[in-house]
A protein has these predicted regions:
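N-terminal accessory regions of S-adenosyl-L-methionine
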Residues: 1-110
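Conserved alpha-helix/loop element of class I SAM-dependent methyltransferases that forms part
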Residues: 107-127
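Conserved class I S-adenosyl-L-methionine
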Residues: 127-135
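Conserved SAM-binding loop of SAM-dependent methyltransferases across substrates and taxa
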Residues: 136-147
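Short beta-strand element of Class I
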Residues: 149-154
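Conserved SAM/SAH-binding beta-strand->alpha-helix loop
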Residues: 157
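Conserved SAM-binding loop
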Residues: 164-165
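S-adenosyl-L-methionine
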Residues: 168-179
Length: 179
């Protein structure tokens, strides 16, 4: 997904049967990016370019430490570029993640909160979930890992948007999360 275009967001909403909201939401997101630019947006865009694209051979969205790829999937050079890009999108508030065997430890242990929530939110299998205040998408990914058919993720932070797209672009197959 082109981070600044959002045409994929619009088509995703249509696929979910949310036609009425597709253009409205995409236009609002475009407006936020245009009218409230973050001074770090260019840096984060460059950081996204350093991250590998579609190279993970496997993903585990149900693990406490979400796993994208495995050790040895990347060349040493690509791994160093990835680590540099991830550092440039600091701080990482939600997680943890394992990206091609490299731990990405966040400020908050979201896996511990998920453990408390998981038994109280009901069965997610086949459900469409709205994740308001999704941060970088950690919980959205865990919901997909728990069987949600799709997640619509909303957060006003442009950093979290970049972090989410950075994680997802490394996956071989994009999860049904619409941020």
């Amino acid at each position: 997904m082109n981070l600044f275009e959002f045409s994929e967001l619009e088509s995703s909403f249509r696929q979910l049967g949310l036609d009425k909201w597709a253009k409205v939401v995409a236009d609002q997101v475009r407006g936020v990016i245009k009218n409230t630019p973050n001074g770090n947006l260019e840096t984060w865009g460059l950081a996204l370019q350093r991250l590998p694209k579609g190279t993970a051979k496997s993903n585990n969205l149900s693990a406490p430490r979400i796993e994208i790829g495995a050790t040895g999937d990347l060349s040493p050079e690509t791994e160093q570029l990835m680590l540099q890009g991830l550092r440039e999108m600091h701080p990482w508030r939600k997680g943890p993640f394992s990206l091609f065997g490299q731990p990405l430890d966040p400020e908050w242990r979201s896996d511990l909160k998920w453990n408390r929530l998981e038994g109280n939110i009901g069965d997610l299998k086949g459900r469409l979930v709205l994740d308001v205040g999704c941060g970088n998408g950690y919980y959205s990914m865990r919901m997909v890992g728990a069987g949600a058919e799709a997640v619509v993720a909303i957060d006003p932070s442009q950093l979290f948007l970049c972090q989410f797209h950075g994680i997802v672009q490394m996956m071989a197959e994009k999860p049904p999360i619409h941020f």
